[in-house]
Amino acid sequence: MSLFASLTDAAYALARPLVHATDGEAAHNLTLAALQPLPRARHALTSPMLATELAGLRFPNPVGLAPGFDKDARVAHAMPHFGFGFVEVGTLTPLPQEGNPRPRLFRLVEDRAIINRMGFNNGGQVAAAERIACLRRHGLPVPLGINIGANKDSADRIADYAKGTAAMAPLADYLTVNISSPNTPGLRALQDRGALEALLDGVAAAQPAGAAKPVFLKVAPDLEPADIDDIVAVALDRGLAAVIVSNTTVARPPLASRHAVEAGGLSGAPLAQLALQCVQDFRAASGGRLPLIAAGGIASAEQAWERIRAGASLVQVYSAMVFEGPGLASRIARGLETLAARDGFARVSDAVGAGA
């Protein structure tokens, strides 16, 4: 693990009781304020064993920052310091929106989980585009993904994704189409086959001429087998670069925290088994033809390795950092090297689907 990540982990361990005593959203905003002045990262954590290629992009290591942490692209420049091999910002909508009323973010400390009902709060694509353009001029040592969504009050949500593509694709290494948040009423209906086909056709038509960017699709974990089959069929037919499995769940396994009754999407440790099963289900449904990115409940190298062996080419983390500290990505990446060597793989990417 880098000295930078080690030092910040040590500082976070001291500050954790105070952080956990603070309102979750306020603590997050303080974290962003602390990260924003950091210098731009010039190097990424990588090695021949960790480097991974997907969708024509080179990822220095397979551990990425999930969207939601840096909604407005304010701290992407600093995140490679903490070991991330790629960074995904957003979700960004065409117009700024406040999101749902507060409180809307709850830490379930006893369960090592989070419930959120943020509702795509963000400053809009125009403001974020200015920051990302500046970042692009100075360079970033890892791929940058931009996660796009629809405004809550939009009269045409499919058109919102086309607008987002036109605005953000020129600045992105890849785009993620997020139709899986449970906190925007009706959004998950866009996972239905007909709606998904129309949405992806609109996204494709809005891509920059001659410079189309890879498109990833982020799906919910609360899907029936027939839904998975339909999504896989559409993804393969429309040439999607990958599917991200998965977003938060509306299901409620047994939880100890008093916040368990709060409405919203559940992430963190209780999501891990369901998210792993989703990777396995999408791998089986696609026959290994559709690249997958795993998210949901990953808090260790062992869990990341399990998702990779189940069929994921990359992994993303966010919620676990609240409990494990900012050096989590670095620890996972270095741990993946150890696990790959233990199991006889020359590269982590060689293990993708090895346990499927």
Curated annotation (Swiss-Prot):
Keywords associated with the record: Cell membrane, Flavoprotein, FMN, Membrane, Oxidoreductase, Pyrimidine biosynthesis
Cell location: Cell membrane
Catalytic reactions of this protein: (S)-dihydroorotate + a quinone = orotate + a quinol
Main location: membrane
InterPro entries in alphabetical order: Aldolase_TIM, DHO_dehydrogenase, Dihydroorotate_DH_2, Dihydroorotate_DH_cat, Dihydroorotate_DH_CS
Cofactor note: Binds 1 FMN per subunit.
Name of the top EC class for this enzyme: oxidoreductase
Record's protein name: Dihydroorotate dehydrogenase (quinone)
Gene3D superfamilies, sorted: Aldolase class I
E.C. designation(s): 1.3.5.2
HAMAP family xref list: DHO_dh_type2
Assembly information from the UniProt record: Monomer.
Sites where the protein binds substrate: K71, N116, R117, M118, G119, F120, N178, N183, N247, T248
Cofactor(s) needed for function: FMN
Molecular function terms, GO-annotated: dihydroorotate dehydrogenase (quinone) activity
Residues reported to bind FMN: P67, G68, F69, D70, K71, T91, N147, N178, K218, S246, G268, G297, Y318, S319
Protein's pathway: Pyrimidine metabolism; UMP biosynthesis via de novo pathway; orotate from (S)-dihydroorotate (quinone route): step 1/1
Function summary: Catalyzes the conversion of dihydroorotate to orotate with quinone as electron acceptor.
PANTHER family according to UniProt: DIHYDROOROTATE DEHYDROGENASE (QUINONE), MITOCHONDRIAL, DIHYDROOROTATE DEHYDROGENASE (QUINONE), MITOCHONDRIAL-RELATED
